[in-house]
Structure formats: structure tokens, C-alpha cells
Amino acid sequence: MRYLAAIIMCMVMALGVSAADKGLKGRVIYVNAGHGGWTANDRPLATINHEIMDTLGFFETKTNLWKALELCSKLREAGAEVVMSRTKNGYVTRGQANATALDRVETDADENGQQQIVGLERIACQVDSINPDYFISIHSNAHVDGSPVNYLVLMYRGETGNDYAKGSIERCKQAFPYIWDNPLSSWTSSSPDDPYIAGDITWMGGTAPGKANRLGYTGYLQVLKHRVPCFLAEGSFHSYQPERHRLLNRDYCRMEGVRYYRAINAYFGGKPEKTGYIVGELKDAAEVMNHPLFCYQKDSFDQYRPINGAMVYLVDERGVAFRAYHTDGEWNGVFVFDDVKPGRYTLRFEAYGYHTRTEQVVVEADRTAYVMTQMHRVISKE
């Protein structure tokens, strides 16, 4: 009898290990990239290089999708089955009064037959029907434009302290430290020790329990009204203008997607990545920005002028530069190296009119090394 009990215990432990080792393989993850159209409702904002409504400039539609696409790519690599509400930009609900000539109705499919859904109740109904293992809605937030306010907030369906889809608070608490890990964002408040995690009714100033949708689920945010434990992530404030300029860099948005991936992967006990990342920002050592569309937090690193068009070289221990990154012209100074093997490296920075600079960096597996550095101008002797 004791022998049989031992065998049963071994079988149970083996099953437990198998389930824990499974990670994301076979999991169904639903990813909603918030917004979808090129309308005035899709958070267009002016930047130094782009007027408002310029699709090459800032639209939350665009930046949300960049984040979501990277997240979904990583999830699929890990064996998850991924459902996206949309995979393209420029889709609106039927009858959208603010639709532009660039927008199409959401029921249209792309060239691969992927239906594009942006109607929030339709998304909620699809999520409830699929009943995935995980749901996330990706957004960025807004305050008064030019305000220094910038923080991360995760919202779940319900009242603060009372999640209507049980398990949502747990998922928010687990995910928050991973998503928050980005010093470039220059957070003004909220941290892993004091996270902004809230019920959507409470945060949005609604009245509990909120209006029910066609499925009978109550709450405030339409996209969360389904049975799946979930949250909506306001990843940062695009009304904080330096952050808005960073969001014009697709690689910067991709790295937010990586942080979402790390949170979800860890939640399901997935294996950590074997490589790491280097993410940084390159600024002038002395010149302070002076532009009405670049209001920065007092005494922050954001006050300094980003260096456009610089070359950043990744140099190995042999002194060989084996990768390079060209900072864009969008006034952010962002540079990114992904899929970097763990080890010690040197970053070499070169830009016209500046002294060459080097920085040492250590890359760890499944981690991001952040580098915020400045370059000194060459002083003319004339």
C-alpha cells in the first residue's frame, strides 16, 4: 500500500512539473491594440516634426499596434496561440462620423483574411466567446497636453479592490513590475512598491456596478466587459511630450511589447529568454530643449536635447563593432539592440559635431540593460 502511494505521489509530482514546464505552449492569448482608425478620436497629437492628424506623426492607433505586434510575435515564438482584434491601422466602426478617407469599416478583412475589429463591445463578445487564457488591452494615457504627468496604470473591470472578473487584480499585481521596468519613461509616480492598479469604475469616476452590455457584464470600459480575468494597460502618458516623441520610435514601442511578454510569460511559468536587450537614450551634454511641443519634467534627463542621426555601435570584447543603430530624426535619441547574448560590451557613440563617446554595458539573459548617456560638442578653435 505504501509502495502504491509512493507511485501515485510520483505521478502527481510529474504531472505538476509537466504543467509548470508547459509555460505558454498551447495557451490562448487575446491581444487588443487600442483604437484603430485615423480619426480625431484616435488621439492624434502634434510633434516637432509632424502636425496633428499626420499619420507619420503620433496616433495612439499606430503606437498601440506596434507594441501589440511585438508582444504577439514573442508569444507565438513561445508556442502560444494568439488572437488579435486587429493587425492593421485605419479601421473604424460602421457609421463613424469622424472617419477619414484613409479609414475602412471594421468588417473588412486584410489581404490575409484577418478580420479587423475595433468596436469595443464586439471585441468583448469575441473574447467571451473564445474564453482565452489571458486578455490584455494595450493603450497609452493622456492628461493636459504638455503636462509633466507620466505613470503606468493597469485597470480591471470593477471597483478598486473588487474585480468583477475574479483573478484580474492578481494578474495586474503580477504584471505591473515587468511593465513598469523602463527608466527612459521618466515616471512621476507609481512604482512596484506603490502600483496604480484600479477598478475601471473607480478610476473613471463611474457608478457601480456600471451599465451591462448585451452579454450582461457590468463595469465601465466596454472592452473589459467579458468573463475573462484581464486588464487594460495605460503604458505611459502620451500627453507628456518627451514620451510622445519616444513613442514615434517603433523600436521603443516594441520594447514595451517585450515587457508585456515578460509579464505574461512569467505568469504562466514560461522559460526565460536566453538573450537580453540594450535600450538607451542619447542626449547633448549641455544643450537644453526649448520648444513648445517638448515640455519636460524639471531637472529630468528629458530636459536635454536628443541627438538625431547619431550612430551607436555595439562592440564586443575583441573590439569588433558587430551591430549598429542609427538614431531617428524624431527628437528622442532612442537606440535599441535586441537578441544580444549575455556578456560585457562597449557602446560607441558617434555624431557629427560631437566627441566620440564610449560606455560599458553588461547584458543579462531575459533582462534589459538601460543606458542613458550624453555627448559633448566639439568646440571650434576659430
Labelled PLM ranges:
Residues H35-T39, F58, V82, K88-V92, ...:
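Solvent-exposed loop/turn segments at secondary-structure junctions
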Residues G276-D284, T373:
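A short, amphipathic beta-strand motif
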Residues V336-D338:
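Hydrophobic core positions of the immunoglobulin-like beta-sandwich fold
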